[in-house]
Each structure stands twice: as structure tokens, then as C-alpha cells.
């Protein structure tokens, strides 16, 4: 079965564990997800079955929208609610100061990814090294905060809604926010609300063509050439400029790349659900 939909991952389990539940629920063997959610996080998880997993890299998943609650005065090496090491009774802040800091953190921000993350360090996930107590450093990266809004402040908990670029770490955003406040902080909760046009709709199967970030092209030649995986000629295409294109037919889809007047199959004959 080929399908794509948004699932609502609950807090308290890994994305892989949750995917296993979905595979058993729908009786499928091949499945995957795009964009890992940490175990403590909940919300939007894009899931695909069958050959649709091959389209993950072509999905339009930006911006990502999160609702995050920052715990002022709490310390955790993993910057979440699973490894709290200390809780300090810190002074309540006025909303004007919090709004000023929120406003400062709009745009592109340099940050260091959390050590408890899925980043690779010499082929090993960073969180595995962190859990084993190994010393290592991660390189600074850039994330972009498009929009932010304070939803609630009930001291010591500050809840914000953030619209961010793909690859952003909300735990790192919280750490920077805490540095500007002058408090140790951690996240007490994190919910991913949406990714681009993807949002939770009771696991409704979606038309994948509406979510692809690639332009459609038209092939005027014999469709059997595509079905048989034969060499295609550039003059048989409506658009002949270099790029990656979707060929969309009633029962299947293909993705091709035009490069130097040569046509290469990136994906071919993916059946529609």
C-alpha cells in the first residue's frame, strides 16, 4: 500500500516506536516518517507507506510550527523534561521584558545543536555519545525564526508559538532565550503543530501531488517508454530547462532530472494509492 498522511505522535515514546504501532494498525511492512520528534515531544509526524517513502526529500515541509513551553529555572543536560537535574526558584519576569527578548530572536540565529540530538558525529548519533558520557563538540548552525508569539506566561512556565525553518532545534532556541533572560531553562513540553501544509487530520490519506516541492512537466512521447524505463529524449518534454520534475499520470508518477540535455530517472513508476 502506498499512502501518506499526518499522524499525531503522543509524548512519551520515540518516533520509531510510534511508527511500529502504525505499521501494526494498518498491516503494512514498509513505512517511514519524515522529521523525527523527540520522545518527550508530541504532534505532527508525516508518515508514508510503501513507495511513497521515496518522496520524503521532495516534500514541502516549511515552515514548521511548534508550541513550546519553556520552564524558567529548571536545568536539564538534554534540554527537555526527561533529565531534570536542578530546579531553582527564580524571580518572575514582566511580560514586557519577555516580549522584548522574543522580538530579538526573530530572523536568522546562530546556534549549537543539542548534544542530545540525532546529529551524526563520525557516523554515530550525538545522543548516543551524550548518553555514554563521551566528550564531543557540535558545529554552530543557522536556524531562522519567521514568526513567534507568546501564548501564555504562568511563572515559571512560558509558552510560545514559533514558525521556523526546517532543521531548527527548539531546544536550542529555548537555551538562547534563557541566556538572554539570565536563567537556566529547559523545555517542559513541545508540540509540532504543522510542517508546511501538513497538519493532523485524523490520519486522513493525502494526495501526495499537492505536497511536492517539484514542478510538473509533460512528456509528449509514448507513455510506454516511461513504463519500460527507456531512454527519454529532451525534445519530447514541454519544459526542457535543467531541473527535477514530476511526471504525473492517472495510475503512477515518475520523477526525472534534466541535466545537460540528458534525462535521468530519479524515481520511476510509483503507483498511486
UniProtKB/Swiss-Prot annotation:
Record-given protein name: tRNA pseudouridine synthase B
Its EC number(s): 5.4.99.25
Alphabetical list of Gene3D superfamilies matching this protein: Pseudouridine synthase (3.30.2350.10)
Catalytic activity line of the entry: uridine(55) in tRNA = pseudouridine(55) in tRNA
Lineage per the UniProt record: Bacteria, Pseudomonadati, Campylobacterota, Epsilonproteobacteria, Campylobacterales
Assigned protein family: Belongs to the pseudouridine synthase TruB family. Type 1 subfamily.
Organism in which the protein naturally occurs: Campylobacter concisus (strain 13826)
GN (gene name): truB
Gene Ontology biological-process annotations: mRNA pseudouridine synthesis; tRNA pseudouridine synthesis
InterPro entries, per database record: PsdUridine_synth_cat_dom_sf, PsdUridine_synth_N, tRNA_psdUridine_synth_TruB
Active site annotation, chain numbering: 38 (nucleophile)
A Pfam family the protein falls into: TruB_N
Amino acid at each position: 500500500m502506498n499512502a501518506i498522511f499526518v499522524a499525531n505522535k503522543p509524548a512519551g515514546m520515540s518516533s520509531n516506536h510510534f511508527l511500529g504501532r502504525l505499521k501494526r494498525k494498518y498491516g503494512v511492512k514498509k513505512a517511514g516518517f519524515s522529521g523525527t520528534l523527540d520522545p518527550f515531544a508530541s504532534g505532527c509526524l508525516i508518515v508514508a507507506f510503501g513507495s511513497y517513502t521515496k518522496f520524503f526529500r521532495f516534500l514541502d515541509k516549511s515552515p514548521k510550527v511548534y508550541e513550546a513551553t519553556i520552564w524558567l529555572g529548571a536545568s536539564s543536560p538534554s534540554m527537555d523534561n526527561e533529565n531534570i537535574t536542578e530546579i531553582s526558584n527564580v524571580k518572575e519576569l514582566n511580560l514586557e521584558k519577555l516580549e522584548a527578548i522574543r522580538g530579538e530572536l526573530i530572523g536568522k540565529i546562530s546556534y549549537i545543536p543539542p548534544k542530545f540530538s540525532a546529529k551524526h558525529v563520525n557516523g554515530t548519533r550525538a545522543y548516543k555519545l551524550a548518553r555514554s558520557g563521551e566528550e564531543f563538540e557540535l558545529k554552530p548552525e543557522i536556524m531562522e525564526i519567521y514568526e513567534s508569539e507568546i501564548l501564555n506566561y504562568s511563572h515559571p512556565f512560558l509558552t510560545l508559538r514559533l514558525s521556523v525553518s526546517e532543521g531548527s532545534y527548539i531546544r536550542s532556541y529555548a537555551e538562547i532565550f534563557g541566556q538572554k533572560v539570565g536563567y537556566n531553562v529547559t523545555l517542559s513540553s513541545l508540540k509540532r503543530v504543522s510542517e508546511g501544509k501538513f497538519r493532523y487530520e485524523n490520519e486522513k490519506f493525502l494526495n501526495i501531488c499537492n505536497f511536492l516541492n517539484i514542478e510538473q512537466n509533460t512528456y509528449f512521447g509514448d507513455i510506454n517508454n516511461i513504463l519500460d524505463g527507456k531512454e527519454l529524449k529532451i525534445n519530447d518534454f514541454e519544459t526542457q530547462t535543467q531541473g527535477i520534475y514530476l511526471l504525473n499520470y492517472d495510475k503512477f508518477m515518475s520523477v526525472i532530472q534534466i541535466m545537460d540535455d540528458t534525462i535521468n530517472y530519479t524515481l520511476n513508476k510509483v503507483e498511486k494509492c
